[in-house]
Amino acid sequence: MTTHETQQSAMPSVWSPDAARLISFVLQFWFDNRRPPNTADVYHGAGFDDYTARRLYRELQLGFAAVVLDDRLQLNIVKALPFSATPTPHKLMVDGHFIAYLGCPGEAFSVSGLPMLDGIQYQVESYCACCYQPIRLSYFGPELQTPADELPTVAVVGNPHMWEHGVPADRVCDDFHFTLDDAHAERFGQRIGRRQLTMKSEQLAALSRPISQRRMRDPASRVWLDAEMHMNGFASVGVDISMWRAADDLGSAE
């Protein structure tokens, strides 16, 4: 998902070496096998027993890189960003073959930074949240090749204050949706009974780019969601965040 790190947070920005190794192993295994690894896969492939893996998964969850049922003996992986074990509208396809579900529209763009996609053509297949008409993004390596006039709109039906400080990634992803255009975004918001903020695909892609460029490459890729920094990030790419600011004003009113 998209985020800006707060410099004021005490949360370290760098993964421990073992956490960095584990998330890289999980993503590569998932890409190669079309599924997340289980505890035996992690033990044989990365060398971490279940006690160590549980501790590392908790570190990855706090750094917004994974969602794991760490209270379960099997340590079931729900998400390892950008991949999702739960079916979503967004599918990564390579040579016509399904690779993995992606968590949300933000991950439909940030997936482009994965090293295993360098130098190949692939697609993200999705659909409009309003009418279920198909949406398709085409890539070559990190480059989005879909013409601008064919890109979908993004409807955001949550507020950054709902996403910050340890909220799991799958909860954040649930607030981001592709729609065919602004009119479909408005109808989607009406249908689910929420106000939506509307943004362009290019804006979300720009927000996702710093994350995508660092994933599996830079150990300083740990993130910490902070509402103010997040809103400033959206504003920096031209998104109208007046709706969110109005909610801030309401919250501070006496």
Model-predicted segments: where are they?
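Long, low-complexity, charge-rich intrinsically disordered regions
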Residues: 96, 100-107, 117-120, 130, ...
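Short helix->loop/beta-hairpin flanking segments within DNA-binding domains
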Residues: 21-35
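Short alpha-helical segments that sit at the start of domains
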Residues: 2-24
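Short amphipathic alpha-helical interaction segments
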Residues: 47-62
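Short acidic, hydrophobic short linear motifs in intrinsically disordered regions
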Residues: 32-45
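Short, cationic-aromatic polyanion-contact patches
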Residues: 13-19, 71-95, 141
